[in-house]
Amino acid sequence: MFTLKKSLLLLFFLGTINLSLCEEERNAEEERRDNPDERDVEVEKRFLGGLIKIVPAMICAVTKKC
């Protein structure tokens, strides 16, 4: 029973370290992405994507030829 507890404790410890390293890596990626130019490009892509979906519906509504 003691060896089982010991191995479970070891697995928990290693898992905690792994999650900690992943979180640090994710934070580093977010810091690199905080460049204002990149954020503007992302916003522009989202805006144009939504606009492309809406334009055909607006044309149909205005011309009433769908």
From Swiss-Prot:
GO CC entries: extracellular region
Segments forming a coiled coil: none
Entry-linked InterPro entries: Antimicrobial_frog_1 (IPR012520), Frog_antimicrobial_propeptide (IPR004275)
Primary location class: secreted
Disulfide partners: 60-66
Compartments where located: Secreted
Tissue/organ expression: Expressed by the skin dorsal glands.
UniProt keyword Transmembrane helix present: no
Signal peptide boundaries: 1-20
Propeptide residue intervals: 21-44
GO biological process per UniProt: defense response to Gram-negative bacterium; defense response to Gram-positive bacterium; killing of cells of another organism
Keyword terms, alphabetized: Amphibian defense peptide, Antibiotic, Antimicrobial, Cleavage on pair of basic residues, Cytolysis, Disulfide bond, Hemolysis, Secreted, Signal
Primary role: Potent microbicidal activity, active against S.aureus and E.coli. It also acts as a membrane-disruptive agent at higher concentrations.
Family: Belongs to the frog skin active peptide (FSAP) family. Brevinin subfamily.
Protein name, UniProt field: Ranalexin
Organism, as annotated: Aquarana catesbeiana
